[in-house]
Amino acid sequence: MSKISLTQVQKMKQSGEKIAMITAYDATFARLFDDEGVHSILVGDSLGMVVQGHNDTLPVTVNDMVYHTANVARGVQNALLIADLPFMSYSDVHSACINAGRLMAAGAKMVKIEGGDWLCDTVKQLNRNGIPVCAHLGLTPQSVHLFGGFRIQGRDAQRAEEIYHHALALQTAGVQMVVLECVPEQLAERITKALRIPVIGIGAGAQTDGQVLVMQDALGVTTGYIPKFSKNFLAETGDVRKAIQLYVEQVANGQFPAAEHTFN
């Protein structure tokens, strides 16, 4: 696989080619995922839960994200590397630019932020500083306490319209990609069709431009609560490399996510 740039990912949307994204937190897994054809690797603040053992992502710091982004970057040759800005690290435009700059210096090619149209000025300023932005809408884990837990978003008409509006506003502001988490498939399809930029789903059905999974979910090593939208690809293959190959293949041909991984 040749090097995947943001331009190439956007062309994949235009051509209908599905985008396979997965999280990674170290160089070894990043290299393996890169070798097996994953298009994009996300250094997620999910590391707070799956690496550090917290109950949510809120304790993750910018220093944590810089450390893991640098580790992952050393293992990536081709995939588009995206890194999360953690909780409260982009609460104002100045902080967002400083902290995003640190992630880019560590090797990220794009940063991801959680939230809606109130972030438009932040997105514009990040773009002015040469930093591409991915927006995260729907179930945004940094707002878990505001939502009253990890709950599906957009099932009622008002909330669905809000999410749709935020997606359009953020695209206008300059966002180059959107992650939609835990929203009904019908809403995800509507947003995907409305946007020019790639829409990556996690628990958002099969009509998005691509899928992302936490690596521990994809490899079946998550303990405790197992999200409905996850699938254990290792169980079908018995080999980590083959599991990732199967994930990329099933995203590409539309087999994943299936109906049992989808919310309506």
Swiss-Prot record:
Q: How is the cofactor bound?
A: Binds 1 Mg(2+) ion per subunit.
Class of this enzyme? transferase
Q: List the disulfide bonds.
A: none
Which UniProt keyword terms apply here?
Answer: Cytoplasm, Magnesium, Metal-binding, Pantothenate biosynthesis, Transferase
Annotated residues that bind 3-methyl-2-oxobutanoate are located at D45, S46, D84, K112
The GO molecular function terms of this record are: 3-methyl-2-oxobutanoate hydroxymethyltransferase activity; magnesium ion binding
List of catalytic residues: E181
Q: Which GO terms describe its cellular component?
A: cytoplasm
Subcellular location per UniProt equals: Cytoplasm
Q: Which cofactor does it need?
A: Mg(2+)
Indicate the quaternary assembly.
Homodecamer; pentamer of dimers.
**Per its record, how is this protein called by name?**
3-methyl-2-oxobutanoate hydroxymethyltransferase
The organism is: Tolumonas auensis (strain DSM 9187 / NBRC 110442 / TA 4)
Gene from which this protein is expressed = panB
